[in-house]
């Protein structure tokens, strides 16, 4: 990584596109409400943009990786309406952040979570986008408890990870909603006073609108934050139980990502969760099995799709039924009723779920069932 020094004036913003690292050498800066500690190095993930806002003049050392970038802009990169909405939230809030792709949903969720953490001591975070999950592998949704502000929600550790079986809610709406329902049940059991739900980005068309209405019926947010997006039936539902709806603008400096880049991000994530994996032979008679999609055939027929170069993305759980790990089913022996699964999961396997993504052991998506 090349290293450069930057001076940022009070009230301005240093925009960093990862992969990069940032170290504040003097002054005070924050990212989405998280104050950065001096002389600590913060790692920025690839294909993500991080706004380091100058609360005072600050100097920083920046290291940039391949394809990364850094630039200083005048003023605050996030709108005044964002900070105003976040600052008006009270203890006991359940916040749902809604918007299309590349509108800043996760950035807003980070700002809200950090604001609630600083004021009230913590919040639960739900990442409900199975295509761009930052708490868990692609094709899953997850929840984490945040005890202190963070510059990147991916730093939080998920206490619940549940499989959806596909990388978009549009590919299997019922499987997605069932997973969200289960996730909310686990989150409510924690007794978290504040909840922030970062929704998926499918918002256009009648089916998307219906899904979002059903989604908020499950979450029951006290506050709906809608970024450059208005779905009347969702607004009416939230207001129907006394919820507050805030419409905010999409910031002008959001990083836009193509479908190819999103696919690359998923591939890197699969690889990370399959790191140090090995092949495990699992007798199917020893585990509970589930096919996540009602539109897919039962497992004996489904597993016939497994090929040497295209395994089936599989989800495994042990004693904790709320924490699933991913694997790739690489072989099915019908006669012996065993499967070979490439996975990093350690310990006994009690449950296996099958989705619809065909995946190589290197983490490349090669098709969908």
Question: What kind of feature is each model-predicted range?
Answer:
Residues 107-108, 135-140, 208-209, 236-238:
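Short acidic, glycine/serine/threonine-rich loops at helix termini
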Residues 108-111, 179-183, 211:
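Well-ordered alpha-helical segments embedded in enzymatic catalytic cores
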Residues 115-119, 190, 218:
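Alpha-helix C-cap/termination motif
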């Amino acid at each position: 990584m090349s290293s450069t020094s930057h001076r940022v004036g009070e009230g301005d913003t240093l925009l960093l596109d990862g992969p990069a690292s940032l170290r504040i050498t003097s002054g005070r800066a924050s990212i989405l409400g998280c104050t950065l500690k001096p002389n600590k190095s913060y790692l920025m993930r690839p294909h993500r943009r991080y706004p380091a806002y100058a609360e005072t003049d600050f100097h920083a050392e920046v290291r940039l990786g391949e394809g990364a970038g850094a630039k200083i802009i005048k003023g605050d990169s996030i709108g005044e309406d964002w900070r105003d909405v976040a600052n008006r939230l009270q203890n006991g809030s359940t916040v749902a952040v809604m918007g299309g792709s590349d509108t800043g949903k996760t950035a807003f969720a980070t700002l809200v979570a950090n604001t609630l953490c600083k004021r009230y001591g913590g919040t639960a975070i739900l990442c409900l986008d199975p295509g761009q999950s930052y708490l868990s592998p692609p094709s899953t949704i997850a929840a984490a408890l945040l005890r202190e502000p963070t510059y990147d929600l991916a730093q939080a550790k998920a206490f619940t990870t549940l499989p959806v079986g596909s990388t978009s809610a549009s590919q299997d709406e019922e499987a997605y909603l069932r997973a969200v329902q289960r996730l909310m049940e686990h989150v409510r059991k924690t007794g978290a006073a504040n909840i922030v739900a970062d929704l998926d980005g499918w918002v256009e068309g009648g089916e998307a609108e219906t899904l979002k209405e059903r989604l908020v019926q499950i979450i029951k947010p006290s506050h709906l934050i809608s970024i450059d997006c208005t779905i009347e039936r969702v607004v009416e539902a939230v207001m129907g139980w006394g919820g507050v709806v805030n419409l905010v603008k999409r910031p002008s400096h959001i990083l836009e990502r193509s479908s190819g880049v999103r696919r690359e991000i998923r591939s890197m994530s699969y690889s990370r969760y399959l790191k140090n994996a090995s092949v495990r032979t699992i007798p199917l008679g020893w585990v509970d099995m589930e096919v996540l999609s009602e539109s897919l055939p039962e497992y004996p027929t489904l597993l016939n799709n497994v090929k040497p170069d295209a395994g089936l993305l599989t989800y495994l759980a042990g004693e904790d039924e709320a924490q699933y790990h991913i694997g790739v089913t690489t072989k099915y022996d019908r006669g012996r009723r065993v499967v070979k699964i490439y996975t990093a999961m350690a310990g006994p396997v009690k449950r296996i779920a099958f989705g619809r993504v065909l995946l190589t052991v290197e983490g490349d998506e090669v098709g969908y069932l």
